[in-house]
Amino acid sequence: MESRPPETECEFDAVVIGAGFGGLYMLHRLRSLGLSVRVYEAGGGVGGTWYWNRYPGARCDVESMQYSYSFSEELEQEWEWSEKYSPQPEILKYANHVAEKFNLHDNIYLSTRVERAVFDENKNRWFIHTDR
């Protein structure tokens, strides 16, 4: 994924911190509601814990189907888990597949840490500060 320029004053309806499985779903859901969304992810890719934890033998301890999103019947039909308890690379591959299928990367800033979030009561607005 290409490097993005730093942002200064940008407005979004919602900001999601993290592009793990919860962050990807939240981005998909908020966009489906017609909201403008930005996701900030500290890692260089999506997948959350499955991006960060790449040690030998890493795999899920719940059935792989528990990681499957149910918001798209087409997605459910086209993805088949190879094992009941999938290894880390397969789970990460699934997260990337979902991000690509639903064009989620367009709204995700990778390698970007949120340093602080400040709520301005007078403006009724959050201000998000990142390391970029």
Residue ranges and their predicted role:
Residues 30, 52-55, 124:
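Short, glycine/charged-enriched secondary-structure capping and boundary segments
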Residues 47-48, 118:
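Short catalytic/ligand-binding loop motif for oxyanion handling, primarily in non-cytosolic enzymes
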Residues 10-39:
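N-terminal Rossmann-like FAD-binding beta1-loop-alpha1 element of flavoenzymes
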Residues 81-132:
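Feature captures the FAD/FMN-dependent oxidoreductase FAD-binding
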Residues 1-12:
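A short, basic/flexible loop-to-alpha-helix module at the beginning of a structural domain
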Residues 29-31, 49, 98, 102:
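Residues within well-ordered alpha helices
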Residues 24, 46-47:
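Catalytic P-loop NTPase motifs of RecA-like helicase/translocase cores
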Residues 44, 51-97:
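Glycine-rich active-site loop/strand segments that organize a redox cofactor
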